[in-house]
Amino acid sequence: MAPRLQLEKAAWRWAETVRPEEVSQEHIETAYRIWLEPCIRGVCRRNCRGNPNCLVGIGEHIWLGEIDENSFHNIDDPNCERRKKNSFVGLTNLGASCYVNTFLQVWFLNLELRQALYLCPSTCSDYTKGDGIRGGKDYEPQTICEHLQYLFALLQNSNRRYIDPSGFVKALGLDTGQQQDAQESSKLFMSLLEDTLSKQKNPDVRNVVQQQFCGEYAYVTVCSQCGRESKLVSKFYELELNIQGHKQLTDCISEFLKEERLEGDNRYFCENCQSKQNATRKIRLLSLPCTLNLQLMRFVFDRQTGHKKKLNAYIGFSESLDMEPYVEHKGGSFVYELSAVLIHRGVSAYSGHYIAHVKDPQSGDWYKFNDEDIEKMEGKKLQLGIEEDLTEPSKSQTRKPKCGKGTHCSRNAYMLVYRLQTQEKNHTMVQVPAFLQELVDRDNSKFEEWCVEMAEMRRQSVDKGRAKHEEVKELYQRLPAGAEPYEFVSLEWLQKWLDESTPTKPIDNNACLCSHDKLHPDKISIMKRISEYAADIFYSRYGGGPRLTVKALCKDCVVERCRILRLKNQLNEDYKTVNNLLKATMKGSDGFWVGKSSLRSWRQLALEQLDEQDGEAEQSNGKINGSPFSKDESKEEKKEEEEELNFNEDILCPHGELSISENERRLVSQEAWSKLQQYFPKAPEFPSYKECCSQCKILEREGEENEALHKMIAKEQKTSLPNLFQDKNRPCLSNWPEDTDALYIVSHFFLDEWRKFVRKPARSTPVSSVGNAALLCPHGGLMFTFPSLTKEDSKLIALIWPSEWQMIQKLFVVDKVIKITRIEVGDVNPSQTQYISEPNLCPDCREGLLCQQQKDLREYTQATIYVHKVVDNKKVMKDSAPELNVSSSETEEDKEEAKPDGEKDPDFNQSNGGTKRQKTSQQGYVAYQKQVIRRSTRHRKVRGEKALLVSANQTLKELKIQIMHAFSVAPFDQNLSIDGKILNDDCATLGTLGVIPESVILLKADEPIADYAAMDDVMQVCMPEEGFKGTGLLGH
């Protein structure tokens, strides 16, 4: 099919030869493209918007042919959330709580601990006996033990694939968005659990933690002089083994028990010898628990970087561990079997993921617990190979050593759990207490109800999809109208009807109506012609309207469009004729004045005028494209039209007469004007003999006289006050001339206005008076103290020489005289200088002015500040910010030394016209205060400096983001300072940090870190590490 524009031209080509009054039904149907050939599927790739008979590519392809019924819904099979047979239940990861999930699974599979927790008294039994379940209330555990009871019961008998541990995590007060130290959390929770169970009356419950996890060792110190042995016995719940420099678990245990020599400054005070003696110290294992927890110290403190790091060394360990060689008392069995391996995936100590490999004590099978996902290992052996291959290899990493039968190697294991062999064999079934089972059954019932509800929703969606499929297959084939009776329906509605993701709404054709409530010819591109049979079914099923039959073809609109098209064609011919007439030489002086601007754009104005006529036809019944037309919108459009100049109005003066400016108009012939007048009958008409506006002539003469007078006044004032105009040789308090007794003050506003007039007297009004009253307070006093003028004061006042003041009094009307006199006080040489002002200072108002100035400096919006980037070896930040080894000032020698290095930084490669910026340090400001008043406070940028627009209420963090875009320095690499003060509170506003307009902030960027994992560590360590402060693990 031809492009839409070609179809548009073809639909109206007949208008070139047919007059409006000759339009027939055939012409109307051609304009509405009734008889265009329909497109064929497979040949037409996409829908032809210019052809109302093209019904291809409107969304029908997804319904034709075979359809997968799963596409009718977006609901997953609820049975996917069901627990698999002979499998375990997973735990939801709440964000960064995977380390908690691994410990919960390990503790759950400790049958003795689970049995003891089930024996704890609980408010849950009261809940099940009372009206809790019958009343439909949700059970809320109150204590840590109750949370574990309920969790373990669900893990044991729930029908769900995974459960939510958020109640338990909230009870501990853990932050689910922050990953904590897994090794520390294990110790703290074990301590909390023991403390909680120690209050139980049942000894099997009270002592379960000690019986299962508690062992004893002794710190034994032997004096080398007398041989005296001292012991310090201590309990342990896990052994913390150093892995650095070791390859096997047995080596780590041997180092843990290794004898240490105490010599030199580290000698031992022997109570028997009553003096410091050389000695040996070691740890002796006195007794071992049933469950032996071995912590592999993978996360250690790095003294060089100042934060934690992970040791990724491989450690070998066996499935069977004989601890007899390491125990002092040899009686009994000390052979342990591996029951759990806790893994940390990731190279950083501050991020990663935790999983657990745990052995089922009843079946002997190994399972991998990864939050919601539980995977059973093939066979009866532990398999760690997949986990060890997850991290990306690097050149510095060592190869994985070969492991023999019954042994394993891991660089990610951080905790090994061994069970005593006798304990491993003596396992019994643990039954869920009846009161807990009742809660589990209730949760299972909710889950089953949810499964039934989801299955029903899936079934309903599939049934609807099938019905829609049959409807589309039936109706789509009957959509083409051919030569049958037809109607028009919007393309958008047809597309939504074929879109399975959105419900079908009633048909709405209002947007396609013209002012005569018929189908607008211009809207045919968004309409489709369908058979009357299909339209009847659509309207009966979905409703809507209005129905657009063959009677909806609007003859009035077609006739009007024909008229406008013919006028546009005529316009093209007349445009050529007028151009030729304008080029021809005029005979005689008779003609008409036409504005040059109007002559350049008359064709465009005529076209717009024709388009407006077309638009007015749409608005004639109060609608635009079928939408109500508001009065407010019409008023705004009229106002805009009034502001735009119509044809030949560009030569009208303000009084509505012919303008006196001859450069803006030209004379055209009578014939040319006649052609133009056909299109603009209401245009102003000015024959060649028409006189210009008399009022404008009078004003022009007066303006010329005033301009000459202003120039004369400006020249006289400039000659009388040359230094004041050029801002040269200005007085200042620090260099008070000896032959001058007094200085005078005028407002800066007066100076600015006067200089503006003198520079451009023709465009400005002469300044007639000096308004010094604005510098005085309501009490008539002065609001400035001259020994301590601020930078803001200097923007308000200017000092004047006595000779200049005399001239000012002659040239201007002065309302208030403000005079400063300097006197020497005291006999000491040099004497102290004082300044006396007339009128006198008003202390209260001066204080108020200073407060207001400070307030204004800290309450600003869209003010300019400057950020100056310094490189590492520049000296500019050394003095004022020693913490960053930087300063806000530098000597000229320092600048010269730093120049070669500064040029290496791309932010320093800026042109500054070869000028050097003045000092902006504290010293520079002190010098400024000594001068008190200076002419220009304009900031001069230098290399490495960029201007930023900021507001007082934006935070330092937001400023750092702006700096990041300007300098390509990440916020965590930015070290900022102002006047020697480090800016480090990201939440503070710029106003509170003392950043005022025109401030210069120094930026020192940290060197980029190539190791992205290390960069993550830096990000984490920048935040104060609080560990488990404020959580339930510390008893809070």
From Swiss-Prot:
It holds the Pfam family UCH. Residues 930-1010 form the Ubiquitin-like domain. The modification N6-acetyllysine is found at residue 957. Residues 896-907 have a biased composition (Basic and acidic residues). It catalyses: Thiol-dependent hydrolysis of ester, thioester, amide, peptide and isopeptide bonds formed by the C-terminal Gly of ubiquitin (a 76-residue protein attached to proteins as an intracellular targeting signal). Present in the brain, in particular in the postsynaptic density and the dendritic lipid raft fractions (at protein level). GO terms for molecular function: cysteine-type deubiquitinase activity; cysteine-type endopeptidase activity; deubiquitinase activity. It is found in: Cytoplasm; Nucleus; Cell projection, Cilium. Residues 89-421 form the USP domain. Interacts with TRAF2 and RELA. Interacts with GPS1. Deubiquitinase that recognizes and hydrolyzes the peptide bond at the C-terminal Gly of ubiquitin. Involved in the processing of polyubiquitin precursors as well as that of ubiquitinated proteins. Plays a role in the regulation of NF-kappa-B activation by TNF receptor superfamily via its interactions with RELA and TRAF2. May also play a regulatory role at postsynaptic sites. Plays an important role in cell cycle progression by deubiquitinating Aurora B/AURKB and thereby extending its stability. In the context of H. This is Ubiquitin carboxyl-terminal hydrolase 48.
